[in-house]
Amino acid sequence: MELKRVVVTGLGAITPVGNSVPEFWENLVNGVSGAGPITHFDASLFKTRFACEVKDFDATKYIDRKEARKMDRYTQLAVAVAKEAVADSGLDIEKEDLNRIGVIFGAGIGGIRTFEEEVGNYAINKENGPKFNPFFIPKMISDIAAGQISIMYGFHGPNYATCSACATSTNAIADAFNLIRLGKANAIVSGGSEAAIAAPGVGGFNAMHALSTRNESPETASRPFSASRDGFVMGEGGGCLVLEELEHAKARGAKIYAEVAGVGMSADAYHLTASHPEGLGAKLVMLNALEDAEMDPKEVDYINVHGTSTPVGDISEAKAIKEVFGDHAFELNISSTKSMTGHLLGAAGAVESIASILAIKNGIVPPTINHEEGDNDENIDYNLNFTFNKAQKREVNVALSNTFGFGGHNACVIFKKYAE
């Protein structure tokens, strides 16, 4: 069976540095940080009192007010980015076979804000007997965003959620890619969203010592590959890609951002939360993606790394890149856009895939901000080009995006410039 080619025809993003794809990209290229004091709850007694929040998000711009009240913030973000991506794709819902359009959209955590609110209310009032919102469960569960998007458009194709912590939305893109190239759908709306900047989310990650505590300077806290890094910065938001079978896209005259070349998945099988110190899972996932794409490592121009600004993770990923790419590792560009957006958890892969695609489209590699001269880690080879502090113009024909999640879940997707 000949596999079909898959292209990207629509993009949607709401992030801490922009509430649309154009705004997101402009701020990435300009090295703008989305970090600031937490406003979603009173974090004054927390070790970490800052995060990368989405600013000025009004769900009612995208959803009827009554329907919005039935959704957790993570689902509201999902619906909003799906609307941008579907509109951007130019899909004519009236003319399409909706049985051949699917939705694969995930969250690493899901409705934690709803869970906190409902369980908190119960704890306060339990002597009066249980009283829960009838929408508690559907607001909380991590699959509901995919369901809401399909209901909104009437898409009857493959529909489910992925959940693999921070690899979630890359897995969603990978599944969409595989289903389309096998002929199971004409198009799939794929991606992820997350809204876990809440007391349980921040408190839980603080308890693990996973978050930066650079409270005096939030905008400089996310500093991947710098010696003074002290943990990741929580972010929130959503990213959505419309993946489409090439001939279907061409037949309707769709614009094509890029082609999906290949995907890879692997497991560290090492630790619940820490990546393998030698980067074994990271190495394997990149090799798997390159094999799937039938691509030589020397063809890759840009890697959007997982690069969370954690002490162990950044070292292991840098090691893996050197092992996979050899001498070419010093020729390609590497950057972590998490230095600006923070870590969007389940939404990270989709948002970073969009950054990778726009690097191809625009010939610009966004920077890794916040690196200071002399702030070098002896365990990291700075002959690698981490694109520190300033975007770089270069031709990008092939971009690779890594995402690694708690539990040892690793996912990688490769995009390439579309050509007939």
Q: In which residue ranges do the predicted regions lie?
A:
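Acyl-CoA/ACP chain-elongation machinery
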Residues: 39, 184-230, 263-277, 307-314, ...
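Active-site-proximal alpha-helical scaffold in enzymes
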Residues: 78-91, 145, 150-153, 158-194, ...
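Condensing-enzyme catalytic core mediating Claisen C-C bond formation in acyl metabolism
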Residues: 5-9, 36, 216-293, 302, ...
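Glycine-/small-residue-rich "gating" segment that lines the acyl/pantetheine channel
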Residues: 123-133, 174, 178, 194-251, ...
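ACP-dependent fatty acid/polyketide chain-elongation machinery
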Residues: 1-67, 247-257, 354-368, 416-420
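Phosphate/pyrophosphate-binding loops at sites that engage ATP/ADP/AMP, CoA/4′-phosphopantetheine
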Residues: 85-97, 249-256, 286-302, 324-328
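Conserved beta-ketoacyl condensing-enzyme motif
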Residues: 8, 23, 29-164, 193-202, ...
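Conserved small-residue
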Residues: 10, 28, 82, 103, ...
